[in-house]
Amino acid sequence: TLYGAEAKYLAAQLMYNAGDYAAAEKEILNFIDQSTPHAYWLARSFILLSDVYVAMDKKLDARQYLLSLQQNYHADDDIEGMIQERLEKLK
């Protein structure tokens, strides 16, 4: 469900905010594996995964996820701005 997709994202966000990056990564990867039809929350999760990887000093992985999302996500919402903001910080 849409609310379930948002809940998975928010759970991972809470783990990230608490500094539990490994748990956040696991939660996001589990959500990705579920093949959700809710593209917005999936995209937000990929962005959060890039934040997790930056925190884990895996900046190359973070950048690759962002670039892939930039190429494959085409909705007219706030995702593109989030991607650009993070890519600028990774330069």
Residue ranges of predicted features:
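Acidic, polar-rich low-complexity tracts and alpha-helical solenoid repeat scaffolds
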Residues: 1-91
